[in-house]
Amino acid sequence: MRLVYSLIFLLFIPFSHPNPIPIPTISPETTNAYLRAFLPWWPEKTDFTLRTAPTPEESEAEIVGNLLESSGEKENVTEFATEKEEIDPSTLRVHDLPPSPLDEFAPEGSPKSLVASGARSSDGNFIISFDEMGECPRDCSNDLRDALGIILQDMSHVERYRQICGKYTNAITCVNEDTRCNKEDRDMFETMTSGLNYMCVEQKLAFNATIKCIDDEAGVVQSECDTQCQTKNLFMNWMMKTAFQDTIQQGVNGIVGAATGTNANPLAFLQPVAGAAGGAPGGGWADMLANIGQRPPSPQDAQQGFENFRQFTNDLCRIGDCMLDCIRSKFNTRCEGSAGTLLSEVFVRPIAATQNKLSILRPILGTFMPEQCGYLTNNAELKKHRIDATMDEELKRMYAEKIAKEARDRTAQDEILANLVPLDENGVPLPRALPELKSIESPLDVSVKTLDQLILDMYSNNKTEELNISEKNNVTSTFSEPSEKEDEASTTVISVISPLHTNATDSEILEHISEKSTEESSGSSGEMSGDGSDNEASGEGSGEYDASGSSGDNSGEFNSSGSSGEASEEGESSGSEDQGSGNYKMIESIESSGEFSGSSGEGSGDTASSDTSIDDKSIIRSGEGSAESVSEILQEASGEDAPTLTPTSEESTGYKIDHSGFGESSGSSGESIELRDSGEGSAEYDASGSSGDNSGDFNSSGSSGEASGVGESSGSEDQGSGNYKKIEVIESSGDYEFSGSSNESIEQSKEGSAASIYEILQAASGEDTPTLTLLSEDSTGY
């Protein structure tokens, strides 16, 4: 991109330097030959010369006449030495073409003295220079010169754009505010800086939006345009050609001087000090080059110089035209479809403004300029590089609306943030800055709460209650008493299962458990201790088997048969002393002491060969039923003497059985059997004993149906049991089998049935079949 800027700088360097190509004073013959080589129509004999010395002031009519008339029309020119005649610029136009709608200055509005001031250049060239300006434009153009220097500096285009626009703003402010600047000075300054005004003022919003993209894509665009326009090859060829021609010219001049005798010493140009011909003082190589530069060129040299100038200018204009087309198309493709057109307008707008100001000289300049430079003098050829008026207005409107929308969005966001969070003077959110706002402490604020307090707050809803365990009464153990540590650990083991009834919700189950926890928290002597079992069966053919004991070996698989349906489920085995083993997959415990709740269905079993005595039994009924007529049940079960029932305690719902010869069993005393009917018509069988070896196979036979499952054993001496909402047991070791015996506890749920109960009682007694009578109308016991 810097190469593009350099190219534009070379194209318009005559506007910033008073005499970029100094032409020495030469003879009229040489000048005429020089001009005829460049201009075929130039007359052979004319007194017109390019002079550097000031000439007498001539009128505008004379200047125009000398440039336009032919040799045959020269005698008709009238000279006005003292008077000045105003000429209408419109009558001098050769190409009457409409100007671009983007041109701010029309040809008719140009200053009338502009042509005269341009024609009265001291060096004979129509060049506008900063040095020829008055005090106002000269002093205010310092920033503009700095802006031209910024073009060649190595920096990003974003920074270059910012600095150039800053320099231009300072310069235009100086021209507008300086009282020494008149209208003509301001008009000239605006013409020269019209491209910068378009970039920094008119289309400022568009360039602000696209300059970042221009900077990102400039490297790729420059490489592609250099290849397309062959700029590097052109400049390299001209450099080599110029150096080669200079070397040849120096050698030819030395040889010609030695051959003609103009140089006394043919090798004088190689010596540091040598005398010139005719006794003139001479120097070395540098003096010879200086003399060659000062010597008037011959007609052949002048013709070759003009030819070289035309060729170089032609190539330069061709590259400029190619680069303008290339950067416009490449940047339009990459940057929002308009960046290339905007840049092209910045480059060519000063040319268009100059064409409109110097419209009277465009035909003359067109005759001197090569064909490839036609767009510099012809407004029609320049139009292809300019932006369309409609597109220019649309870009202004589009970017103005875009900026306005962004401003509205930012304002709306600021208002929302201001209402949500107050800000201090630095824009930092301060939620506690305003006193009227109530500060809200974050639960994760470590400065307010410690980690321990956070943990307690998180689990504050999961409250626990102390587990109450009844005292040890009437318990005889054949094993040593557990240690204090084992006893304390065993009290925390909870092996009570709370089945999920199909018709009951979790809240109802929890409420039921809470009501029963206070009534059945402690039992009679020997309650919830020793070896035993708990068998429950659901109405849908599923159940869980649970057994707890403190002494004895409680491990294995429990098989039981019920009265109706098939019940299979996985149980759990645990204990404190010689306890069984089992794997727990998931346990959700709701603590309660001494309560069992069973699922719907019924389960029954006979305890025999269990190494336990039934001399001292306790029978408990819970739920909607009661423990009425328990004596009748036992009397009917034995067929002989009815056992004596004695309450185990005042607050207990169990009874102690004084019985002798009631069935056959081996083992120690102190077994307690609990039989409960839940409020939802569900039942659960639980048996616990204090001593005995409950190992081996237990078989429980019933009248109809089978109930089998992997059982569970847990507990310790005088240990209460809690309610488990869900227990999944993976495995348990050992097989337990119950065989029927006398004095069997029987329970019927509301959803189950008591089929073949006579057969159960007959198998239990071995003799007479007792008569079954309902205890009450609402009761399910017999």
Swiss-Prot record:
Domain of life: Eukaryota
Stretch forming the signal peptide: 1-18
Region: Disordered, residue numbers: 513-726
Residues with glycosylation annotation: 76, 208, 462, 468, 474, 503, 559, 691, 699, 701, 704, 708, 714, 721, 743
Magnesium listed as a keyword: no
PANTHER family xref list: CHONDROITIN PROTEOGLYCAN 4 (PTHR37442:SF2), F18A1.7 PROTEIN-RELATED (PTHR37442)
Protein name as catalogued: Chondroitin proteoglycan 4
Origin species: Caenorhabditis elegans
Lineage, opening ranks: Eukaryota, Metazoa, Ecdysozoa, Nematoda, Chromadorea
Gene name, Swiss-Prot/TrEMBL: cpg-4
